[in-house]
Amino acid sequence: MGGDDYWIVKIDSFGNIQWQNTIGGNDNDQLSTLQQTIDGGYILGGSSLSGISGDKTEVGYGGWDYWIVKIDSTGSIQWQNSMGGSDYDYLRSIQQTSDGGFILGGYSASNISGDKAENCLGVFDYWIVKIDSLGNIQWENTIGEMVMMFCHPYSKLLKVALL
């Protein structure tokens, strides 16, 4: 499609390819996290520089944006959502919640703009977003201080997990 794209390959227990799908727009789209969902599909999360183009049907807000794509058990897109502010927003972790929605964890350099309701306090702050089962934002929260704070699945500072 464009630069980098999401590439998903489903394999069986013997390593045989069952299906594969490339999803992206006309610029760079980088997949950083995925999880099987309770309905047997998958939720894909990453960051995108693409505007509406190719498979991407959501606008960009400026710089990198969170890009969430829900696919079914055969790899077909069910829905997608792009969210962010006017600067750089990088999605690093996604977990399904007990209500069928998702909690997203990443970091942001965006001030109030687009989907961001709070200013960035440092260079990058944690940006936590709760979405419902169809990808609609329910709430979002910026957590940070006057330093760089990064959120990703392997971080010892902040892990996005459900307890």
Q: What residue spans do the PLM features occupy?
A:
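A sequence-level/structural motif corresponding to short, flexible coil/turn segments enriched
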Residues: 1-163
